[in-house]
């Protein structure tokens, strides 16, 4: 009986002691993290004191939301060369927008910034974009032949076919005078192109109602990944996976992976046919996916399923979304500068007449159109920034230095709007790219630069030329004055309110 009388008291004392211990441990951990946060921030302030910065919140940093580009352009004019941007917590990055600074960083072999790019891994895996070191070099060397001019030449006709499908859809619209949000159409068109060129897809995804689910998943992942990078709490995978954003991200990843898995499965099935297999093996240059399927690594083994899907996911995203962004912004730039649009149209007509076919040789015969495309990519670079994590200290030409471990972000948008290298940077002036106009080798980087530049830059540039040439033959592009696009910082440059144009049929 005595035991039963005292047990509840002892039990309560035990529970109370447990909670006291848990509270003290939690308090210790909070204090430890607070001290760690303070010391890290003080170290960063000292180490990067030569890089100016505007006042920021101690926890949220420079919370720019969707005003990032407006603020960045202010910094570019106010702080020559580079400046400091505080993100959430003790995270910071040095923004570089001077060609001399950019040249130094791109001339090194620093890895991609893990604190930023790691959040892409659940989506695109470790393909060319995220790989570093020896494995990156092996994959880059393996995939470079997929962009040999011998491969790219026949792609021009495929690109033209995809563009014409999009233009046919535009011609069938009931109300030609009503502004159209063009990015949706352009995104499906570039996806159609990359599916046919790189993945031997038959048919057209532009005519497949289910294809919209993939482009919508990519759009969602663009936004969700960007928000996660900027969040003070979503860096923790447990917290992120429990959040509504985490659940949306997993669902979008599932949709994207189902799409790419289907592409791989379909091509593998085609290669089970002996005739198709022999046809592929006899090619002088293999397509992108066939290179991956036939690849042998240095150990003699085939590419793992994980590596295979990572490269397919990476190129499926980069091969269509960045190009769709570029084409959409070029269309907008031409719509708002009708005199340049008309000059491009006249140039294209002089080469193609009223035809709908474009050849490889035609692409070098439209210099003014090419100048306009390049100027639009200067104003609206599809990838607004790239980041590196310094593997060793770096010193710039003016003597300022950054220690190992710091993230440097090459702010391509700021670089392209730097008034020290681009007079009147907000003005659309294609003559900047005339053959006799000199410029710094690293002042213009729409496809990044250095050893890790965009492997598909020639593919993308060809597609831009084909899309612009064929569109100008069939439509006059007019702006919607009620909805002026607002550039928005994401993984790929987007507009906060879409890109709306009026399309006037020419024939």
Swiss-Prot record:
It is a peripheral membrane protein. Induction: By clofibrate. Keywords: Endoplasmic reticulum, Heme, Iron, Membrane, Metal-binding, Microsome, Monooxygenase, NADP, Oxidoreductase, Phosphoprotein. One of its GO terms (molecular function) is alkane 1-monooxygenase activity. The keyword NADP applies. Changing residue 318 to Q: Significant reduction in covalent heme binding. GO terms for biological process: arachidonate metabolic process; icosanoid biosynthetic process; kidney development; lauric acid metabolic process; linoleic acid metabolic process; response to 3-methylcholanthrene. It comes from Rattus norvegicus (Rat). Changing residue 63 to N: Has no significant effect on the catalytic activity toward lauric and myristic acids. It catalyses: an omega-methyl-long-chain fatty acid + reduced [NADPH--hemoprotein reductase] + O2 = an omega-hydroxy-long-chain fatty acid + oxidized [NADPH--hemoprotein reductase] + H2O + H(+); dodecanoate + reduced [NADPH--hemoprotein reductase] + O2 = (11R)-hydroxydodecanoate + oxidized [NADPH--hemoprotein reductase] + H2O + H(+); dodecanoate + reduced [NADPH--hemoprotein reductase] + O2 = 12-hydroxydodecanoate + oxidized [NADPH--hemoprotein reductase] + H2O + H(+); tetradecanoate + reduced [NADPH--hemoprotein reductase] + O2 = 14-hydroxytetradecanoate + oxidized [NADPH--hemoprotein reductase] + H2O + H(+). Gene3D superfamilies: Cytochrome P450 (1.10.630.10). InterPro entries: Cyt_P450, Cyt_P450_CS, Cyt_P450_E_grp-I, Cyt_P450_sf, Cytochrome_P450_Monoox. Its EC number is 1.14.14.80. Heme binds at residues 318, 454. Its cofactor is heme. Pathway: Lipid metabolism; fatty acid metabolism. GO terms for cellular component: endoplasmic reticulum membrane; intracellular membrane-bounded organelle. Residues 1-4 form a propeptide. It is found in: Endoplasmic reticulum membrane; Microsome membrane. A cytochrome P450 monooxygenase that catalyzes omega and omega-1 hydroxylation of saturated fatty acids. Exhibits preferential omega versus omega-1 regioselectivity and (R) versus (S) stereoselectivity for hydroxylation of dodecanoic (lauric) acid. Mechanistically, uses molecular oxygen inserting one oxygen atom into a substrate, and reducing the second into a water molecule, with two electrons provided by NADPH via cytochrome P450 reductase (CPR; NADPH-ferrihemoprotein reductase). This is Cytochrome P450 4A14. Belongs to the cytochrome P450 family.
């Amino acid at each position: 009986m005595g035991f039963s009388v005292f047990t509840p008291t002892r039990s309560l004392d035990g529970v109370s002691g447990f909670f006291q211990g848990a509270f003290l441990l939690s308090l210790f951990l909070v204090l430890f993290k607070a001290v760690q946060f303070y010391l890290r921030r003080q170290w960063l302030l000292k180490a990067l004191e030569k890089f100016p910065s505007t006042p920021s919140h101690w926890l949220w940093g420079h919370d720019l939301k969707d005003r990032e580009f407006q603020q960045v352009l202010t910094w570019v004019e106010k702080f020559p060369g580079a400046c400091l941007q505080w993100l959430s917590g003790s995270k910071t990055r040095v923004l570089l927008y001077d060609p001399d600074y950019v040249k130094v960083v791109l001339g090194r072999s620093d890895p991609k910034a893990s604190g930023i790019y790691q959040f892409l891994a659940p989506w695109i895996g470790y393909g060319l974009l995220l790989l570093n070191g020896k494995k990156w070099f092996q994959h880059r060397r393996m995939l470079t032949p997929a962009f040999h001019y011998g491969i790219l030449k026949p792609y021009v006709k495929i690109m033209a076919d995809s563009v014409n499908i999009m233009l046919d859809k535009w011609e069938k619209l009931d109300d030609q005078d009503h502004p159209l949000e063009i990015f949706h159409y352009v995104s499906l068109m570039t996806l159609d192109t990359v599916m046919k060129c790189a993945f031997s897809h038959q048919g057209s995804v532009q005519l497949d109602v289910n294809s919209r689910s993939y482009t919508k998943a990519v759009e969602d992942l663009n936004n969700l990944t960007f928000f996660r990078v900027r969040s003070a709490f979503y860096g923790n995978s447990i917290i992120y996976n429990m959040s509504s954003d985490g659940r949306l991200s997993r669902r979008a990843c599932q949709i994207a992976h189902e799409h790419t898995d289907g592409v791989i499965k379909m091509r593998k099935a085609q290669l089970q046919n002996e005739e198709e297999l022999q046809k592929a093996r006899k090619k002088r240059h293999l397509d992108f996916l066939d290179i991956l399927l036939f690849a042998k690594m240095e150990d003699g083994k085939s590419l793992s399923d994980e590596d295979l899907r990572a490269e397919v996911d990476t190129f499926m995203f980069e091969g269509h979304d960045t190009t769709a962004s570029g084409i959409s912004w070029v269309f907008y730039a031409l719509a708002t500068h009708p005199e340049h649009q008309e000059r491009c149209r006249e140039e294209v007509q002089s080469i193609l007449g009223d035809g709908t076919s474009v050849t490889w040789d035609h692409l070098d015969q439209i210099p003014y159109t090419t100048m306009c495309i390049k100027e639009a990519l200067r104003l609206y670079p599809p990838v607004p920034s790239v980041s590196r994590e310094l593997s060793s200290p770096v010193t710039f030409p003016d003597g300022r230095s950054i220690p190992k471990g710091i993230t440097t972000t090459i702010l391509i948008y700021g670089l392209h709007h730097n008034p020290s290298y681009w007079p009147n940077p907000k003005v659309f002036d294609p003559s900047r790219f005339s053959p006799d106009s000199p410029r710094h080798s690293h002042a213009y980087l729409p496809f990044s630069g250095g050893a890790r530049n965009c492997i598909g830059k020639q593919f993308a540039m060809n597609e831009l030329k084909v899309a612009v040439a064929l569109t100008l033959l069939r439509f006059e592009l007019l702006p919607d004055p009620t909805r002026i696009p607002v550039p928005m910082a994401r993984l790929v440059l987007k507009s906060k309110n879409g890109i709306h144009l009026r399309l006037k049929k020419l024939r």
